C-alpha cells in the first residue's frame, strides 16, 4: 500500500488553519493523478472528507499524455474509493460518495442512508485502543475483495498509524520548495520515541524532480 504526504521543505503539510491548496505545483498534482489511475483503490479518512470534501477520483484531463495513451477516456476505470468512518460522519452530501464508481465506508456500526452513488459499508471491529476501525482487518478484507493496490491520501495521524502497523509498502513524498513555519501541520504523526534506535527507517528508492518540486519514493525498513 502506498501512502502519499505532500510537504514543504520543513516537513509541513498545511498551515495551522488547515490551508494546503496548493503547497505543491500543478506538475506534482498531475503526477498524483497518474498514481491514482494505476491503483485498485484510494483510501482516505472521514476527517479528510469533512475537512476538504475531496473527490478522490481520477480526472482524465489531468493525466499526463503517457498515461492518457494507456487509459483512453472511454476506458478509464475509477479506483474504488474507501473511507474509514468509525463515527459515521460521512453523509450523502459529500462529493466522494456521489461520483461514478464504487465507494466503500469502513465502519464499526451500520447506518442506512439514501446514497446517490454506489456506496456500501464494510463493518469492522475497533482496534481495541480507541474507537477507530481496525486497519489490519480492513486490509485483510480488501485483500479478500482482490483489492491489492491501495493508494492512501490522508492526514498525518492516519499515515502514521498505517506506518506503525507495518501497512505501508511505499511512502511517496512530494516536497515543495517552501517553508511553512513552526505552527504548520506536520508530515507524519507517530508515537513518541525514547531513543533514536526506535525511529522508523527507510530506503530511498528514487528521487525525481517534478516541476519545481521533488518526489521522494521510500521503502520502509520494517
Regions found by a protein language model. Name each.
Residues 140, 147-149, 154, 165, ...:
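Helical hairpin unit composed of two closely spaced alpha helices linked by a short loop
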Residues 5-9, 13-149, 157-160:
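Active-site ligand-binding patch in enzyme domains
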Residues 1-2:
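Positively charged, low-complexity/disordered segments
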Residues 88-90, 110-112, 128, 178, ...:
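Residue-level detector of flexible, active-site-proximal loop/helix-junction positions
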